Amino acid sequence: MVRLRKPLPPYTLKTPEGGKIYLPDLKGRALVLLKDEALAQALSARAAELKALGAQAYLLAQAPRPSPLPLLLDLEGALLPALPEGGALVADAFLEVYHLGSVSGEEEVLDWLRFVEAQCPECVLPEADWF
């Protein structure tokens, strides 16, 4: 089950070519998962911004289809039901889910990625420095 502020479950998805993608192997970059093709198209047009934010976006589907973003197949329906239509899942580089819900467009997805980037553990004072 996908939950906010929890690590993304260790699901295995497929590529259209038959390869397997184990979600924990995607650690190291912020992650965006979508199921809305129009949102995927809008986000793919802003690929340079995604790259600058160190993020990777994927379109999820149950069957192969043309996609403006890399396509991942959720054949077992493990993740697709968790994503709302027109919504997104945004996770940090450690795959902690920060957003799972509706978005008003690609700009809001990018805003979530900027927020996630600002949450890095190195960006805050160590606890000892608070006193």
Predicted regions and their residues:
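Chalcogenol-based redox active-site neighborhoods
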Residues: M1-F131
